Curated annotation (Swiss-Prot):
Active site: R173, S223, E293
Encoding gene, per UniProt annotation: murB
Residue ranges constituting the FAD-binding PCMH-type domain according to the UniProt record: 30-194
A GO BP entry: peptidoglycan biosynthetic process
Compartment annotation: Cytoplasm
Superkingdom of origin: Bacteria
Protein name (Swiss-Prot/TrEMBL): UDP-N-acetylenolpyruvoylglucosamine reductase
Family (UniProt): Belongs to the MurB family.
């Protein structure tokens, strides 16, 4: 029995799509095919997929809403798991519990409806709750670390554990999950009682700022660089004269230099080449080395063509 036949038998009932283009699920609108794109409906299906992948030695990864990710043009080998169907959100007093696939912006709106404050900073951050925890997403002085009470995860070995904020060792755009290989299942956020109108006014203000300053009208990978200590990445890029700088179909936004935008059917290679070129030019101009915030995943097109049969153990 081939691995694919075994997969269809053991993972029967789970939504698995073969050779699925990743660009349909990415904010960048680029990316090659995933060998197996999986949409588990609950944590039990997710655990089944992870267990099967581990047993068969098939690589796997979980993507949130792919808002701060570039999938290379050659695609991703193995399983790519999208958790957007794990999206339940509940409110208990001043606590919101959200599954990993819940939309982060919608979760902040649920907090607003219940007059809970503390989540306003995230009202315009695209992505999923799980992805936000993974990278300790933040904006306008707030971040996930400030409000996370606990986080339920599936370890890479298939065990379910509950972690505290301390366990997650949050840092700037970092959590311990990035090294552990665990998968976020659900998160509890500790908020505070507030006034609906005050919360709404703050969310409206932050949303307006984001619309004013960021190129939301174009596909992009979000904020491409982490903030260097004592500096702003966008300012360093602007000072080097790089606004409007373009490689292929991707260019540095004139509106916000920290964003690389897809203006003309750009490719993942265009994104990657532009980001690397910006890093080099900023280093040359200011002596400061920018660090990528966006994650780059998968294989280049040239590598994928060398192994046109896909992931070797998975005979199709």
């Amino acid at each position: 029995m081939s691995v694919r036949e075994k997969m269809l038998e053991i993972l029967e009932g789970i939504d698995i799509r073969f050779q699925e283009p990743x660009h349909s699920y990415s904010y960048t609108k680029v990316g090659g095919e995933a060998d197996y794109l999986v949409f588990p409906r609950n944590r039990f299906e997710l655990a089944r997929v992870v267990k099967f992948a581990n047993q068969e030695n098939i690589p796997w990864m979980v993507l949130g809403n792919a808002s701060n990710i570039i999938v290379r043009d050659g695609g991703i080998r193995g399983f790519v798991i999208l958790c957007d169907k794990l999206n339940n959100v509940s409110v208990d007093g001043y606590t919101i519990e959200a599954e990993a696939g819940a939309n982060l912006i919608e979760t902040t709106r649920i907090a607003l409806r219940h007059s809970l404050t503390g989540f306003e900073f995230a009202c315009g951050i695209p992505g999923s709750v799980g992805g936000a925890v993974f990278m300790n997403a933040g904006a306008y002085g707030g971040e996930i670390a400030h409000i996370l009470q606990s986080c339920k995860v599936l370890t890479k070995d298939g065990e379910i554990e509950t972690l505290s904020a301390k366990d997650l060792a949050f840092g700037y755009r970092h959590s311990a999950i990035q090294e552990s290989g665990a998968v976020v299942l659900s998160v509890k956020f500790a908020l505070a009682p507030g006034t609906h109108q005050v919360i709404k006014q703050e969310m409206d203000r932050l949303t307006h700022l984001r619309e004013l300053k960021q190129p939301l009208e174009y596909p992009s990978c979000g904020s491409x660089f982490k903030r260097p200590v004592g500096h702003f990445a966008x300012q360093l890029i602007s000072e080097x004269g790089l606004k409007g700088y373009r490689i292929g179909g991707v260019e540095v936004s004139e509106k916000h230099a920290g964003f690389m935008i897809n203006v003309a059917d750009g490719t993942a290679k265009d994104y990657e080449d532009l980001i690397q070129s910006v890093i080099e030019k900023v280093k040359e101009h200011s002596g400061i080395t920018l660090e990528r915030e966006v994650r780059i995943l998968g294989e280049s097109l040239s590598v994928a063509k060398m192994y046109a049969g896909g992931f070797t153990p998975c005979k199709r």
